[in-house]
Amino acid sequence: MGPVTGMTPDKNIETPAAEKVPGLSQTENMGSLPEEVGAARPKASMVDSGTTDEELTNLNWLHESTNLLNNFSLGSEGVPTGSPLYDIEGDLSPSGCQTPEKLSASSKPPYSFSLLIYMAIEHSPNKCLPVKDIYSWILDRFPYFATAPTGWKNSVRHNLSLNKYFQKVERSHGKVNGKGSLWCVDPEYKPSLIQALKKQPFSSALALYTPPTSPTSVSSRSSVSSLSSVEEVYEFIPKNSRAGSDGSEGFHSEDDTDIDYEEDMLGDSGYVSQPCINPSSNDLHGNKLRKEACQDIDDELKEAAGSLLHLAGIRTCLDSLLKTAKAQSQKHRK
């Protein structure tokens, strides 16, 4: 019995020593392993305060990363808000957020097609232009459209015909032989166009890059004077030649108007009923448009009729199958 009791303390003494060795090895390994290993062993008895300090440091790093979010929010202050005058084709490009000095002559202008048309019409002496003269004004002021896809002309025509800000007017008696139609700005919606024009990116840099003006000019800019607003825009619009702009923005000769008459698709589209000078050509063009519209409607009706017949056939088959199944079920019951 004596040796038995003597061995018991020895085992008790050796057992803690055996437990301390793995414990020390665990703490040494934890100091060298990444912090994820320490987080995966929450029940370890020998975890020191250094590991918790490292974890807190990581949390502080995450807290400091909010400065990056602040930088992103500060960098987005210069982006203008959306406007109903921004049509589909007139989306703001990245170059639209730059200052006027950084805008190159070949960069995309930060204006919608509605505003481009408005500026072109207001710069003309008679405040009305045909479609081809609007093209010429845009090409003179913005060389970007000289190499842009030709679809921008379709966008101009669509804005003229479908936009409520513009209306078709009758040619004066001095231009009896002229073809096509003239377009002007509806006075009812002119204040909306002026307000949208002042919200463009150039307005924020207007006070920095324009020559000092008198208080009267500042008050006139806030009024509903379309001419003053348009002239402010011209200070930042890239031009190929400013000297010849005044003479080229009026009415062109009759020969020039006849050459580009085919491009004036809106001249006789009939969106606004106005007296016409040449009824024969208008009748021919109107008949052609009506025939094309009728052809499209006939094709759509044929497709719809075919779909209805197909659905009717499916419904008939389903009804016959239901009747057959019902008759068979009644026979089985009998």
Swiss-Prot record:
Q: GO CC terms for this protein?
A: nucleus
The places in or outside the cell where this protein is found are: Nucleus
Which PROSITE patterns does the record match to this protein?
A: FORK_HEAD_1, FORK_HEAD_2, FORK_HEAD_3
Q: Which residue ranges does the Swiss-Prot or TrEMBL entry mark as DNA-binding? A: 108-204
Q: Where is this region: Disordered?
A: 1-52, 83-108
* Entry keywords, A to Z: DNA-binding, Nucleus, Transcription, Transcription regulation
Query: Which Gene3D superfamilies does this chain map to?
Result: Winged helix-like DNA-binding domain superfamily/Winged helix DNA-binding domain
- Principal subcellular localisation of the protein: nucleus
Query: What's a Gene Ontology MF term here?
Result: DNA-binding transcription factor activity
Please give the name of this protein: Forkhead box protein N2
Query: What is the native source organism of this protein?
Result: Xenopus tropicalis (Western clawed frog)
